[in-house]
Amino acid sequence: MKTITTDWELIPYSEAWSRQTEWFDALVHAKQNGESYENRIIFCEHPHVYTLGRSGKENNMLLGEEQLKTIGATLYHIDRGGDITYHGPGQLVCYPILNLEEFGLGLKEYVHLLEEAVIRVCASYGVVAGRLEKATGVWLEGDTSRARKICAIGVRSSHYVTMHGLALNVNTDLRYFSYIHPCGFIDKGVTSLQQELGHSIDMAEVKERLGRELLAALLSK
């Protein structure tokens, strides 16, 4: 089956979640019934929003409802793995809706593939990134006291079909992370390509590079 890349650009989180769920359910149904389907890789950005995963703790959100309103943000409890994270303008969000069995992937291998694609994109900008033991996502200087996350990953899988995905900080306003314990960590920082390089990055270029890396990784399986 073919894999289609789609760009939703700036889209409210609730709308993106609804569309994702619709396509996810359709792929699961098609797979179970032997029907044709399309794998999708979706790119987008969101207005300021926080999402709390299934294993997340409420106290990792440091603001109350009224305080969230004052910073123009909302909070959603969602059905992915992981704890709390932030999405906002300048952050590249990627939602792959894929049949993992088609690519010979298990869930752990799939998360590793997402991490590797982001690591390669960072390297293409001269930013050395890697993994942190017992923590998903992509990190800089992960084995030091200066460890900081540049990409969060949280997925949902059912019948080896995926939704949700990754969030890469490109030109993100990092102040919004100060209102949470990102991914449940209280002793780790966050960063962005802009923060590391000292200048803004062309978002369209990052999308192109990440899309290329993801497709290459999937097709190599």
UniProtKB/Swiss-Prot annotation:
Biological classification of the source: Bacteria, Pseudomonadati, Bacteroidota, Bacteroidia, Bacteroidales
Similarity field: Belongs to the LipB family.
Domain BPL/LPL catalytic: 35-221
Organism listed in the record: Bacteroides fragilis (strain ATCC 25285 / DSM 2151 / CCUG 4856 / JCM 11019 / LMG 10263 / NCTC 9343 / Onslow / VPI 2553 / EN-2)
Predominant location: cytoplasm
Gene, per the UniProt record: lipB
Residue ranges crossing the lipid bilayer per the database entry: none
Binding-site positions, substrate: R80, G81, G82, D83, I84, T85, Y86, H87, A152, I153, G154, G165, L166, A167
Active-site residues (renumbered): C183
Signal peptide coordinates: none
Record key words, sorted: Acyltransferase, Cytoplasm, Transferase
InterPro entries: aa-tRNA-synth_II/BPL/LPL, BPL_LPL_catalytic, Octanoyltransferase, Octanoyltransferase_CS
Top-rank taxon: Bacteria
PANTHER family (alphabetical): OCTANOYLTRANSFERASE
An example Gene Ontology biological process: protein modification process
Protein name: Octanoyltransferase
Pfam family, one: LplA-B_cat
Functional description taken from the UniProt entry: Catalyzes the transfer of endogenously produced octanoic acid from octanoyl-acyl-carrier-protein onto the lipoyl domains of lipoate-dependent enzymes. Lipoyl-ACP can also act as a substrate although octanoyl-ACP is likely to be the physiological substrate.
Miscellaneous remark of the record: In the reaction, the free carboxyl group of octanoic acid is attached via an amide linkage to the epsilon-amino group of a specific lysine residue of lipoyl domains of lipoate-dependent enzymes.
CDD domains referenced in this protein's UniProt entry, alphabetically: LipB
